[in-house]
Structure formats: structure tokens, C-alpha cells
């Protein structure tokens, strides 16, 4: 399981950020922290609440934020447009990201075998995980204040 202090596992997927293009995490690491916000399913209630909170209540100025789900890129493109999400979404239908971060959720009762567990990771410019949050129960959202703090700390370390 990926935890604080670990090197962030690299993975490839598809980025939905206006267009659909290849995504590799290592290519996105650099000067500012990267936040990976894993969520189970586009268009579901709690996931939409979380993505809207990240849009409206989370200060993205000091980081690069990506929402990550196992949804297909074209579904994520429609979702991103409908909810006016100003950050990229990463489509992980091959489960490379959720396996690398060990955030796999069984959703068989919904007719889908595997989705992303709701989780958030902050990765500093050196590629080290500095913050990890995992949902303990269905419908739980991250502590956005704690996430803001974690990003600020990672950004301050990069500036030092």
C-alpha cells in the first residue's frame, strides 16, 4: 500500500483536460505538488459532491490536481464538461493507477467489478507521497482543510 514517505508509483492512463491525451504521472511531477483525488464513478452523487468541492472549496493555486477514476475517457470528458471542472480527469479503465496505489474498491453490487476507492494523495516535486487519505466508509469525503494544509506544506518544502 502506498503511504506517506513512499516514492509515488508511476502509472500511465488517459488525461481528459479539454482533449483526451496520454497521461504518465512522472511527466507531471515538478515544481509544485500533484494531488491525485481517486473517486469511484463519474456522475454518482458523492463523487460529484467531491469533485464540485474540489472545484469550489479547494485552493488549487499551489498544486496540480487530477481526479482519477476507472471511467472511460469519453465519459469523463462529458462529466468534466457537465460539471465545469477546471482540472484534469484521469481515466484509468485498465486499473493501472488504482492497482499501483492499492485503492481498489469492489463494486459488484452495482454491476461493476472494480472501481477506485475514494482516496487522496499529495505528491511533492521530488515524487514523494507527503499526504494520504483513504475513505473509511461509503459516502465519506476528504477533509478539505487538511488537504489544503498538506498542499501548502508540500509547496513550502519545494520553495525552501
Protein language model features and the residues they cover:
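Chalcogenol-based redox active-site neighborhoods
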Residues: 1-160
Amino acid at each position: 500500500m502506498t503511504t506517506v514517505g513512499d516514492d509515488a508509483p508511476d502509472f500511465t492512463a488517459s488525461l481528459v483536460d479539454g482533449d483526451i491525451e496520454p497521461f504518465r504521472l512522472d511527466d507531471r511531477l515538478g515544481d509544485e505538488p500533484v494531488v491525485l483525488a481517486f473517486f469511484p464513478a463519474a456522475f454518482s452523487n458523492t463523487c460529484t459532491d467531491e469533485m464540485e468541492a474540489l472545484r469550489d472549496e479547494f485552493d488549487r493555486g499551489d498544486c496540480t490536481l487530477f481526479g482519477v477514476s476507472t471511467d472511460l475517457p469519453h465519459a469523463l470528458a462529458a462529466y468534466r464538461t457537465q460539471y465545469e471542472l477546471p482540472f484534469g480527469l484521469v481515466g484509468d479503465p485498465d486499473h493501472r493507477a488504482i492497482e499501483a496505489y492499492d485503492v481498489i474498491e469492489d463494486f459488484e453490487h452495482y454491476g461493476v467489478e472494480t472501481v477506485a476507492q475514494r482516496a487522496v494523495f499529495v505528491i511533492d516535486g521530488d515524487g514523494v507521497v507527503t499526504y494520504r487519505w483513504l475513505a473509511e466508509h461509503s459516502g465519506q469525503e476528504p477533509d478539505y482543510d487538511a488537504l489544503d494544509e498538506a498542499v501548502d506544506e508540500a509547496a513550502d518544502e519545494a520553495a525552501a
